[in-house]
Amino acid sequence: MPKKTVAIIGYGALGNILASALRQTLSEDYQVSGIWTRHIQRDMERIRQDGFRPYGSFEALLADKPDYAVEIASVEAVRMYGETLLRAGISLVVTSVGALAEDELRETLAQSAQANGTRVYVTSGAVGGFDVLQTVALMGNARGCIENVKAPESLQGAPYLEGKSLPLDRQQTVFRGTAREAIAGFPKNVNVAVASALASVGVDAMQVVIDSCPGKQDNLHRITVENDGVRAVIEVASRPDPGNPRSSVMTAWSVVALLRNLASPIEFF
């Protein structure tokens, strides 16, 4: 069978990890067709040096008609490019899942995918267990909560914390609210909360707690979804990416796992 082609949108620390991982581990099934960033003139030489093809424009990506486009850039990238990609017959892999907390955007992407025979794939990112979360929620009367514990530097720049200082000598809860409220206040920090919510109880029912913990070396995510008969707890601790303390290297590898699953005759759910 011919290889499937994958375009990558975004080439920060995680985009670089993803492109290299696809080349190293899935080269029999996939080929990276090219890479596009909003700052392509700045990034073009680095992309070439790494052995990949830079797209000179977003239109060049569309004209190339890859099988999949992987967004590994930002919520804004999902807003800007998602619908256009789907209408062009290109399936979309989303890592900045926080974008899907916007009901109108999520519905637009769903309708575009359905009308054009494409799909939107939501990656598990820095967590996982979406199959369990879906199952528990489908059984009915489900409740959900996700606790996030991160070092203060991982939370820097969040709109919710503008004008606020975080203590450097003790752990402190800095946010309590719904997943929808969390992604508005922490757009680069809680994609996992939105993904877990969409897979289970919804963004308005999923409760989110964010703690700042000085000296913490990893990002801790503890997801609890329960109903009257089942209580599921998923806990993942992962070290942040050295190049971007707000993100986990696991996010890039979750895309690799998704694509491997899509290429396999046996799928794990």
Language-model regions: role of each:
Residues 9, 17, 121, 126-269:
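Active-site-lining helix/loop region of Rossmann-like oxidoreductase modules
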